[in-house]
Regions:
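Alpha-helical membrane insertion/targeting regions
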Residues: 1-137
Length: 137
């Protein structure tokens, strides 16, 4: 498989995870707790699928160097740096939030859940921008 195809598939899964997080957030706001749990679990699986594809692509194919126009390289670099920071932070917050929910530590889960969600939304947005700048533009 090509780097472009694997990157396209992994980008789909990270966007899917963000969409599912948004749906899960709306569900919990409407007191649909069981649907929230299932949707957030699906979001976590989608994010994990992204991560597995990303790591596999990196290990077996390698990183893709920026090959676009020089005037876009600074934007690519800025989005990439922010994406790496957000993705790392979001992953840690995500694990802590999920564990708090499954351990029924709802005070902690409710406190950090919205923060985690917002970080994840920005992670997905910056990830899509990195993808677009690397493969499309």
């Amino acid at each position: 498989m090509s780097s472009l195809l694997l990157s396209s598939i992994s980008t789909f899964f990270i966007v899917l995870s963000a969409v599912l997080v948004a749906i899960g957030w709306a569900l919990v706001k409407n007191k649909k707790i069981e649907a929230h749990k299932k949707t957030m679990f699906a979001a976590a699986i989608s994010a994990l699928t992204f991560f597995i594809i990303y790591v596999s692509r990196t290990l077996f194919i390698g990183n893709t160097a920026f090959g676009g126009p020089d005037e876009y390289k600074i934007y690519y670099t800025i989005f990439l740096v922010f994406h790496i920071i957000l993705a790392t932070t979001g992953a840690v917050f995500g694990i802590v939030t999920i564990l708090a929910g499954y351990k029924n530590n709802l005070v902690r889960h409710r406190k950090i859940g919205p923060v985690t969600s917002i970080i994840w939304f920005f992670t997905a947005i910056t990830g899509v921008m990195v993808y677009l700048l690397l493969y499309i533009i």
